[in-house]
Design a protein with these regions (language model features):
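Short beta-strand scaffold segments in enzyme catalytic cores
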Residues: 35-41
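Glycine/small-residue-rich phosphate/adenosyl-binding loop
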Residues: 48, 71-83
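A short, polar/charged loop-to-alpha-helix boundary motif
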Residues: 53-72
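Zinc-dependent deaminase
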Residues: 2-27, 108-220
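Short beta->alpha transition motifs characteristic of CBS
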Residues: 45-55
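Immediate flanking context of iron-sulfur cluster ligation sites
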Residues: 85-95
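Short, ordered coil/turn segments that flank beta-strands lining enzyme active or ligand-binding pockets
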Residues: 30, 42-43
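Local cysteine-cluster metal-coordination motifs and their immediate loop/turn environment
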Residues: 93-111
Length: 220
């Protein structure tokens, strides 16, 4: 029987999916861009985690905090010891990693990359896929899989779009172009944007009021 609530669905979700989304929500709560990443070993154990800190005010708690390098994937990889062999590890991310993060994963020897949803920012800014395609098939490049199925894909991008709408306004180009590129995620994000503040303490609490709307939108 399918879960009837957001909280139940998250509790039964695969670990990397749940943690990527929870970390993305932590970034949203901090006023940043909702992206999360988790590195798993070959047995499915968590090696390291990270969230986007690029738009956080510098506090000294993260070396890259408040810089354009502070993507979720880089923050996760920065927690890994230099002498670790990452060939059997998988780097999960809430959105498809950008070329910088893909290159970093390849440089440190990550074996595989998996992501929940396509990157709305890259799509909305018409970023060329040529730089990502340049990595395809190159020696030492991690294998890549994604996006995942519903409702996780829609939730990942709804959080991403929501974080932009909440901090930069609903007319931001990423939000505006999502009307054509990802209407299900946009519908969910706008429903969440209209909800009460402050944000609920848990991701399940955030999604619960719009759970039925989200599932309907994800089904198309």
């Amino acid at each position: 029987m399918a879960p009837t609530s957001a909280t139940d669905a998250l509790a039964t979700a695969d670990l990397p999916i749940r943690r990527c989304l929870e970390l993305a929500y932590e970034a949203l709560q901090a006023g940043g861009l909702a992206c999360g990443s988790v590195l798993l070993d070959a047995s499915g154990g968590v090696v390291a985690e990270g969230r986007n800190h690029a738009y956080d005010p510098p506090t000294g708690s993260q070396p890259l905090e408040g810089t354009p390098l502070a993507h979720a994937e880089l923050n996760a990889l920065a927690r890994v010891a230099t002498d670790r062999d990452l060939a059997g590890d998988t780097l999960w991310s809430s959105q498809e990693p950008c070329s910088m993060c893909t290159a970093a994963a390849a440089f440190v020897g990550v074996g595989a990359i998996a992501y929940l949803a396509p990157d709305p920012w890259a799509l909305a800014t018409s970023q060329s896929r040529a730089q990502e395609d340049a990595f395809a098939g190159a020696a030492g490049t991690p294998s890549v899989s994604g996006p995942v199925g519903e409702p996780w894909r829609t939730i990942a991008n709804a959080l991403f779009i929501l974080s932009i709408a909440a901090t930069r306004g609903p007319d931001h180009s990423t939000v505006a172009r999502s009307r054509d590129l990802d209407p299900a995620a946009l519908e969910t994000a706008l429903a969440l944007l209209a909800g009460p503040r402050p944000w609920p303490p848990t991701l399940g609490g955030l999604l619960e009021p719009v759970w039925d709307v989200l599932l309907k939108a994800a089904r198309g």
